[in-house]
Amino acid sequence: MNYLVVIDTNVLISALLSKHSDSATVQVLNAVFDGTIIPVFNDEILAEYDNVLHRPKFKFPDANIQSLLDTMKTYGVFAKQLITNEILPEPKDLVFYEVVMAKQDENAYLVTGNSKHFPKKPFIVTPNELLDIMK
């Protein structure tokens, strides 16, 4: 089974920085590469991924960043934002929420390490919760 998932940037960063191959964030990222997770995004989300992944403090090689972004674009799904009246504690997170809302008719999830930044909804999950759903 495949799962449509909007992936918050913090999940990608955590996966790439993790030294544990069995961590939940690494397993989520691996599921993107094996096709179990179909990433959902728009241009703003891709730009955020690119911007954050290129921050000097992370020292991720350009080739690795490009490979990840290319995989997301090739195997993922582009979605327009569904404009909502939601007020979030972190306004920059609104795009992730609105993109997942646009795909609710297809049972999409938003996976984040910062669930407190989003409304409590059953489709907004932590990496561990997503892995449980995928079992």
Annotated model-derived regions:
Residues V6-I7, A24-H54:
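PIN/NYN-family metal-dependent endoribonuclease catalytic core
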Residues L12-I13, A47, H117-P119:
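Short, active-site-adjacent cap segments at secondary-structure transitions
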Residues E90-Y109:
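Acidic, metal-associated active-site segment
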